[in-house]
Amino acid sequence: MSAALAAAVQPSAPASAQTADRLSHLKRLEAEAIHIFRETVAETENPVMLYSIGKDSSVLLHLALKAFAPGRLPFPLLHVDTTWKFREMIAFRDARAKELGLDLLVHTNPDGLARGVGPVSHGSEVHTDVMKTQALRQALDKHKFDAAFGGARRDEEASRAKERIISLRTAQHRWDPKRQRAEPWHLYNLKKKRGESLRVFPLSNWTELDIWLYIEQENIPIVPLYFAQERPVVEREGQLIMVDDERLPLEPGETPQQRLVRFRTLGCYPLTGAVESDAATLPEIIGETLAARTSERQGRVIDKDGAGAMERKKQEGYF
């Protein structure tokens, strides 16, 4: 048991009891997620798993492999590629797909690509709508998927906190918060009308701390960007933006500085801020998570696109 894990529990309880409680908590979350995977596959015709390459996707993939072991995954993975992911993320994606023999689908909005839509040229709102939301809807329609697994968690953000594990979407992939279904006693309603689809979130009840403890317990590979390292960054509007390639134009007088940083959350690189940190190991990251007083999504620029931005995006078909 790591020192960070020991610090997470009350010191008054015996160490053995503390470990048992924490592990049983993770085992309960694991069992719930595996049940959701199996139930969805049994009740839908053509499911897919959305794979965004981050820590939650890595845990989600690990759970899916456990749910259907020793067989192959009964569904493909879908990565919506905005062309603005960190280079280390794409390298990690390709390496994991090859290592595990995954059926990986990669989709980029061809219209957005032709128009050159990006976060620098068009801003975060247009980029997110065209290269993420519209691209996702295109891919789901193209392959006729009727259920999509995602790694969203309720503790991340307000609109995600009120979304059900099984989230009904219209034929246009829109989410209506008023049409949510009750889910008592882990009973899930996967029925839908023709043309409707489902978004399924097996990690809904996990916290950021749970994710890191499970990654440590299961030794799950993750993108190196989560670990502290000297990286070239510029500071803009309170965010440390990593200069990942030449596409990020520098402002007058701006010079990238090497700073010891890591990422708590990963997205398109100009829209994702790093945090100053010296946490270079999983126990150190867990310790930082325990001490954190801000959301991991504080570094997501898209969450600052006006009040209710995330809920509005979800209603339009976002993850």
UniProtKB/Swiss-Prot annotation:
HAMAP family: Sulf_adenylyltr_sub2 (MF_00064)
Gene source species: Methylobacterium radiotolerans (strain ATCC 27329 / DSM 1819 / JCM 2831 / NBRC 15690 / NCIMB 10815 / 0-1)
Taxonomic lineage from the root: Bacteria, Pseudomonadati, Pseudomonadota, Alphaproteobacteria, Hyphomicrobiales
The protein, known as: Sulfate adenylyltransferase subunit 2
Family: Belongs to the PAPS reductase family. CysD subfamily.
PANTHER family: SULFATE ADENYLYLTRANSFERASE SUBUNIT 2 (PTHR43196:SF1)
Subunit structure: Heterodimer composed of CysD, the smaller subunit, and CysN.
A single GO BP: sulfate assimilation
CDD domains, per database record: Sulfate_adenylyltransferase_2
Catalysis: reaction(s): sulfate + ATP + H(+) = adenosine 5'-phosphosulfate + diphosphate
